[in-house]
């Protein structure tokens, strides 16, 4: 027994023996027969071993139900032997007519679901008194072995997992917020979840391989799966609709929301404040499942209570004031991640090169550090960023291969630095946050284009093009033709006309061209 498979987990394993009869399966006879018949119809002719693989049903249940379907004329054996597992069955005309009605009502084909009652009880057993957790030192050490620095952040993350309370992480871009939060699930014990559950004849999907990583040891009943604590990451794409469980008619299942998929693990709302929907609405939607550890989904309009024992984590590049007091109470622990030290960024850069199995001249490490050292020390004075370290290492690999070299030298590094967009923008002293502001494009008609151009540049305009007796410029969205005309008049620049020709988001391309 260990942290990832304790006595409680072993007891659950013993309880999850594969059912051998319909009563223990806790699914209706009609549901089981309908599932089998849909599989036979979809294949046309199929071997019973394939039906067994798809449904996860015990051979006793499978043989009993297929035999009954055969007797009622819905399917017929077409080949096989004395072994039931090698018999092939085909759908009959009568069976095909029967399947039409079943599939219209419930098109799901797959592993047999678990009953709602069994799901609820098993989850309740696992989540009862889950916190506080005693995390072994070996688990902590293994979890953070590839995390450089940020000792204070590690402590807060550990404490969040011990007591099961939410955490709020904020700070400048590139400081590793998402990365450190992604380590939290490794601190938590695993759990067992159903792949699917049945409620009112409908199927709800719980297991999602995109978020749920299987453990090596699995229960005997294949309808259940033991997973490591999940890490469910949502970002700017998150919307109110995505926080709900929605029906997928193509699969014939209700697909659970991130709130439910994160049960037993971490739900990270990344880039808080960047979502299309108001972040206040999103946070308000999370309050009930965070507080009650349960959420409600609707199946045919009927409310179904499901478990949502997740630890909420929020990250943002914005200020902590983006969350009000009611929301912060659900995430009482906080971490401010400042820009890392130059030495830490260099260490991450070196680690990434080694992970990429790149050989390199040692002098490139000093040159890389020089990018972030202060100008007083002879450096470029750029803001240190863990994200830069990873990206530049990968770009170095690309440049080295493209140049046909065997190792990364200063020349390769210099070219890689010159190709990293954020490093280039910092060198140009361009604030990326300002680039998204709207601009107005003006057509300015003037007799003396040279004098008018200089006056517009002095005003802060960005010259785009000239056409005949006009100049096309970009200015801030708040500038009006009257204000611009008044300014040029005071500069003794004769203007024949000013008109707004477009309003748009400021383009990075134009910013770079104007440098």
What positions do the PLM features span?
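Dynamic helix-loop-helix/coil hinge segments at AAA+ ATPase domain boundaries and subdomain interfaces
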Residues: 128-153
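A short, conserved structural fragment
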Residues: 70-81
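Conserved AAA+ ATPase core "coupling" helix
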Residues: 280-283, 323-355
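Conserved ASCE/P-loop NTPase catalytic core
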Residues: 145-313
């Amino acid at each position: 027994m260990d942290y990832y498979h304790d006595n409680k987990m072993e007891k659950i394993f013993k309880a999850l023996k594969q059912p051998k009869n319909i009563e223990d399966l806790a699914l209706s006879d009609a549901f089981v027969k309908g599932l089998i018949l849909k599989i036979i119809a979809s294949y046309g002719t199929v071997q019973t071993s394939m039906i067994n693989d798809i449904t996860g049903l015990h051979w006793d249940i499978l043989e009993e139900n297929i035999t009954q379907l055969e007797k009622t004329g819905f399917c017929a054996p077409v080949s096989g032997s004395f072994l039931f597992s090698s018999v092939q069955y085909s759908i009959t005309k009568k069976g095909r007519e029967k399947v039409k009605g079943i599939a219209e009502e419930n098109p799901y084909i797959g592993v047999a679901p678990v009953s709602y009652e069994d799901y609820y009880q098993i989850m309740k057993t696992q989540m009862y008194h889950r916190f506080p957790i005693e995390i072994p030192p070996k688990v902590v050490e293994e979890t953070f072995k590839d995390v450089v620095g940020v000792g204070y952040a590690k402590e807060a993350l550990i404490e969040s997992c011990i007591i099961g309370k939410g955490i709020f992480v904020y700070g400048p871009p590139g400081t590793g917020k998402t990365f450190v939060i992604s380590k939290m699930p490794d601190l938590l014990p695993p759990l067992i979840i159903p792949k699917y559950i049945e409620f009112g004849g409908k199927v709800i999907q719980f297991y999602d391989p995109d978020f749920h990583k299987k453990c090596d040891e699995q229960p005997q009943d294949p309808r259940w799966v033991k997973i490591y604590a999940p890490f469910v990451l949502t970002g700017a794409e998150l919307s109110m609709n995505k926080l709900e469980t929605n029906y997928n008619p193509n699969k014939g299942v209700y697909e659970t929301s991130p709130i439910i998929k994160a049960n037993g693990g971490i739900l990270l709302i990344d880039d808080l404040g960047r979502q299309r929907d108001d972040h206040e609405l999103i946070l308000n939607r999370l309050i009930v499942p965070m507080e009650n550890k349960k959420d409600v989904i609707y199946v045919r309009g009927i409310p179904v209570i499901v478990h949502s024992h997740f630890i909420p984590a929020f990250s943002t590049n914005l200020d902590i004031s983006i969350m009000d007091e009611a929301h912060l109470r659900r995430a009482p622990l906080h971490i401010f991640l400042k820009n890392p030290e130059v030495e830490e960024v260099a260490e991450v850069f070196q680690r990434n090169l080694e992970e990429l199995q790149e050989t390199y001249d040692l002098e490139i490490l000093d040159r890389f550090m020089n990018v972030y050292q202060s100008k007083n020390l002879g450096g470029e004075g750029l803001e240190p960023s863990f994200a830069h370290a990873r990206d530049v290492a990968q770009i170095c690999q690309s440049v080295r291969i493209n140049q046909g070299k065997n190792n990364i030298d200063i020349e390769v590094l210099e070219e890689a630095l010159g190709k990293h967009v954020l490093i280039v923008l910092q060198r140009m002293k361009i604030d990326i946050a300002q680039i998204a502001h709207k601009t107005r494009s003006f057509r300015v008609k003037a007799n003396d284009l040279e004098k008018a151009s200089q006056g517009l540049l002095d005003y802060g305009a960005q010259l785009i093009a000239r056409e005949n007796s006009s100049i096309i410029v970009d200015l801030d969205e708040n500038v009006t033709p009257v204000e611009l005309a008044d300014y040029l008049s005071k500069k003794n620049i004769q203007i024949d006309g000013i008109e707004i020709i477009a309003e748009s988001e400021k383009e990075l391309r134009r910013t770079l061209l104007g440098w």
